[in-house]
Amino acid sequence: MSSKYIEVPSNAMLLERDMDKTPVLETMHLGIDFGGLTAVDEFNLTIGRTEIVGLIGPNGAGKTTVFNLLTKVYQPTRGTILLNGKETSGMNTVQVNKAGIARTFQNIRLFSALTVEDNVKIGLHNSMNAGMFSGILRLPRHWKNERVAHERALELLSIFEMEDLANHQAGSLPYGAQRRLEIVRALATNPSLLLLDEPAAGMNPSETAELMENIRKIRDTFQIAVMLIEHDMNLVMGICEGIAVLNYGKIIAKGTPEEIQNNPQVIEAYLGKQKEDGQ
């Protein structure tokens, strides 16, 4: 992979992050009810600074609801969320994104008529300091920020070897490339925790293997944590250091991939069901 644009964090930055032992995410007794239905209950999870954690479970178990709680699409009925040691109660989706959580979605949500680079620049918006009037009046600060955004967008695209596609229309990209672009755009917000909702959906085995390599590269290069929802068990077991299994809105098991694979409750509730279905 070309390293022309890759920006590796400084040794001082990496040392600072390494010295900070505060978990990137802690949830305590997190839950939400919709009417009289409990969708998620007693969701307790801790994610370390550079951990890759998987959240698995049958369809309808509440996995995406958990992501919606973490990103404040939904406000929890009960419980506490600590992001980098600080409570997120009262925050909205924009505020929690600025505080350090970025995500992708099950369904691609790109601006298909814009270029690849412009999609990444939209993700960079929160970290840019240019005001509205500097943009309208085309002040020097505006042009400086445009230059910085262009360079940063290419740096991020190079992680997935997509810098040569910068001027292509996002909607013209193959499906797998569009999913990678979503991850790049999420990274552009400079998160400390990246949430990936079924990142391998629609990918062939070769693309999935490349995705695994790139997720590790993202974690190692930017020293961030990654939490993913995924039905591809080869990906989950191959990349995650910790796994939580959700069933009917509750965590039924937490542990290493090996521990999860050998957990009777998990085999019955999820992995075993897949075997019965011949998957």
Label the predicted regions.
Residues S2-Q279:
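Glycine-rich phosphate-binding loops of nucleotide-dependent enzymes
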